[in-house]
């Protein structure tokens, strides 16, 4: 048996996931509550969730979840999006005030469909076009960040403990057939809203503990 100091376990995060193989919908309150017993495996520098099947009314559209530092940035980004997409719906993502979740950016979502004329001109399929668009915004548009971009799914994340982040985003009002959750415990990096897990691109979302 190894003694104290001979074992190093670098992972310190909290994770949870639930999926219905039958495709039955589950409230986001379930996954939020699942994170509560793991409170001490996070340190409040990042919590997040991803839900699948949560946008049945817009299931054929890409749901862009975005952070903006200021209104002018959002307007500039929206003008950019209108050049590339049909924007079917644009709205602020509903939240509730939570004392432990502070300094929130502007949190917005767009339900969009790539313009066929743009796809034809660029000779790209939808997925490659989406990846390039998300990458361009996140690397070139200061103050704008796409943190979720799939169909009929969405990531929700913030600086805070995951159970508080779930309440902040009102996940109890969503229903999905699959949920993942993560609580960060960074020891050498700062917490920022875009850096919380899950990391999402198209329909994929990633959480990890190391």
Please report, for each region that a protein language model flagged, where it lies by residue:
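Structural motif
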Residues: 13, 47-48, 177-179, 204-205
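Extended, highly charged
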Residues: 54-177, 181
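A short acidic-Thr-Gly-centered motif at the start of a beta-strand
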Residues: 188-203
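Solvent-exposed alpha-helices and their adjacent loops that cap or buttress functional pockets
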Residues: 6-9, 148, 169-174, 198-201
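Extreme N-terminus nucleophile/cap motif
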Residues: 1-61, 120-155
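Short, glycine-/Ser/Thr-/acidic-enriched flexible segments
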Residues: 20-23, 56, 69-73, 185-187, ...
